């Protein structure tokens, strides 16, 4: 029997507000433990919450960008549970009437088809504190308590771990592009839980689901869902009874581990938050927020394909972050060579950034300087290989490519007569390579070209070198 997965994701995005959701404490990441706190976020007796207007604005903005309907009347609710990281012993969240409902994200499958993944709801809530486990015991840091979140709950429309990854990637790019969250998974500002069950292909009856936590990267998400799918299929095939439970992804051992049996909604005893009034959202406010939404990543990618004539894949990669998209567009316009710009950004520049773990905004050179480098190569002033060396220098120093080329004497040699002398010398000193070439070994020419480039310290025009080596070898 063939099975398919039924997957839904719950994504928590930390909002990029300056202050917490119900008080004036800073949301800045880091800081000494328990220094970004006050009586409100510590839940001290007598303290009263006040809803941060910017949080509501960001909730509306996210909902509009994700094709949701905005609930014009919504409320906050108490979710009751006892855990050390929850200082009030309840979380102020939204239950029955969230701020947004019924949205979707469109993803592109491997075969090029597009698929809509439904979004059931988006609700606002506060984050909990953070537990720090030591040999001596467990400590609690409440700096994160009260930091505003939106939870985006998808419908169970996802059928493979790969689809789940595409959904999360698209969601991340949208949220970061509208600047409601920085979506830094390594800092916990974007967190994802997954719900998965399996059912026979063609069936409409979902199986017993498991919730998986601790999936803190795209790779972890895909691996955890794949593992859990295999575990469910094996259990069902053997006739075992699966129970609804919450499991944790163990990255070190590549397995999911049981945490607890799954709670039900009534275990949390939800009821309206009496210290906060019902929220009324006007049509005028919604339209004001709508005007602040920029061109979304998929819209920008489509425009790049049409305007700059770059491949669809390039456009999708370049629009994963708005900083990269902006850098590309500015460089492409200045260099008048969009494909070369795309190649440099997706290739050598991305490699250098990954090596140093930095982002586009941290680069020491600007789009104008990269455009200058591309123009130097296209004009034949320097070769592509020399261009890579110049880029390395630009990356370290931030100097302009022209200055680097002049300082280091890297101007390309286009003098055929001078290059021909070197070619003849190399051929004369390597008779075996000529013999190999005559015997049908085409790679022998590549060897000779490499020797010429080495002799000229990479300054000879590669096209001229290739032409002259081929001509001289055929004369022998």
UniProtKB/Swiss-Prot annotation:
What is this enzyme's catalytic activity, as reactions? L-glutamyl-tRNA(Gln) + L-glutamine + ATP + H2O = L-glutaminyl-tRNA(Gln) + L-glutamate + ADP + phosphate + H(+); L-aspartyl-tRNA(Asn) + L-glutamine + ATP + H2O = L-asparaginyl-tRNA(Asn) + L-glutamate + ADP + phosphate + 2 H(+)
- GO biological process entries: glutaminyl-tRNAGln biosynthesis via transamidation; translation
Give the gene name: gatB
* InterPro entries recorded: Asn/Gln-tRNA_amidoTrfase_suB/E, Asn/Gln-tRNA_Trfase_suB/E_cat, Asn/Gln_amidotransferase, Asn/Gln_tRNA_amidoTrase-B-like, GatB, GatB_C_1, GatB_Yqey_C_2, Gln-tRNA_amidoTrfase_suB_CS
User: Which source organism does the UniProt entry give?
Assistant: Clostridium botulinum (strain Langeland / NCTC 10281 / Type F)
EC number(s)? 6.3.5.-
Give TM regions: none
Q: What is this protein identified as? A: Aspartyl/glutamyl-tRNA(Asn/Gln) amidotransferase subunit B
Keywords assigned by UniProt, alphabetized? ATP-binding, Ligase, Nucleotide-binding, Protein biosynthesis
Q: Which Pfam families match?
A: GatB_N, GatB_Yqey
**Keyword match Ligase:** yes
Its biological purpose:
Allows the formation of correctly charged Asn-tRNA(Asn) or Gln-tRNA(Gln) through the transamidation of misacylated Asp-tRNA(Asn) or Glu-tRNA(Gln) in organisms which lack either or both of asparaginyl-tRNA or glutaminyl-tRNA synthetases. The reaction takes place in the presence of glutamine and ATP through an activated phospho-Asp-tRNA(Asn) or phospho-Glu-tRNA(Gln).
């Amino acid at each position: 029997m063939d099975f398919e997965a039924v997957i839904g994701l719950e994504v928590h995005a930390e909002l990029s507000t300056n202050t917490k959701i119900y008080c004036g404490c800073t949301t800045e990441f880091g800081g000494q433990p328990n220094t970004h706190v006050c009586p409100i976020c510590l839940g001290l007796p007598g303290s009263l919450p006040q809803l941060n207007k910017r949080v509501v604005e960001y909730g509306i903005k996210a909902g509009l960008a994700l094709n949701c309907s905005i609930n014009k009347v919504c409320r906050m609710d108490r979710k009751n549970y006892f855990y050390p990281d929850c200082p009030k012993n309840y979380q102020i969240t939204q239950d029955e009437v969230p701020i947004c409902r019924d949205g979707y994200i469109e993803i592109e499958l491997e075969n090029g088809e597009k698929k809509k993944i439904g979004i059931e709801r988006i609700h606002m809530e506060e984050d909990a504190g953070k537990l720090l486990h030591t040999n001596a015991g467990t400590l609690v840091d409440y700096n994160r308590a009260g930091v505003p979140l939106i939870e985006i709950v998808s419908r169970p429309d996802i059928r493979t771990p790969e689809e789940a990854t595409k959904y999360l990637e698209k969601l991340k790019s949208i949220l970061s592009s509208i600047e409601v969250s920085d979506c830094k998974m390594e800092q916990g500002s974007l967190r994802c839980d997954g719900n998965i069950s399996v059912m026979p292909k063609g069936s409409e009856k979902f199986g017993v689901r498991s919730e998986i936590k601790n999936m803190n990267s795209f790779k972890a998400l895909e691996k955890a869902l794949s593992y859990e799918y295999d575990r469910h299929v094996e259990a069902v095939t053997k006739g075992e009874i699966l129970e609804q439970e919450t499991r944790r992804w163990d990255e070190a051992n590549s397995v999911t581990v049981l945490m607890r049996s799954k709670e039900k909604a009534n275990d949390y005893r939800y009821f309206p938050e009496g210290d906060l009034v019902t929220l009324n959202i006007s049509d005028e406010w919604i339209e004001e927020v709508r005007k602040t939404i920029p061109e979304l990543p998929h819209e920008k990618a489509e425009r790049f394909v049409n305007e700059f004539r770059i491949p669809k894949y390039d456009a999708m990669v370049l629009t994963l972050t708005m900083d990269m998209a902006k850098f590309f567009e500015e460089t492409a316009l200045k260099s008048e060579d969009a494909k070369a710009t795309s190649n440099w950004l997706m290739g050598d520049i991305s490699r250098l950034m990954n090596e140093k773990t930095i982002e586009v905004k941290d680069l020491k050179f600007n789009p104008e300087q990269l455009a200058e480098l591309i123009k130097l190569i296209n004009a034949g002033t320097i070769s592509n290989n020399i261009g890579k060396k110049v880029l390395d220098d630009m990356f370290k120093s931030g100097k302009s490519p022209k200055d680097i080329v002049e300082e280091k004497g890297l101007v390309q040699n286009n003098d055929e007569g001078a290059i021909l002398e070197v070619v003849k010398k190399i051929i004369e000193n390597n008779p075996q390579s000529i013999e190999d070439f005559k015997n049908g070994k085409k790679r022998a020419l590549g060897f000779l070209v490499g020797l010429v480039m080495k002799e000229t310290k990479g300054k000879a025009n590669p096209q001229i070198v290739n032409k002259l080596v081929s001509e001289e070898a055929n004369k022998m």
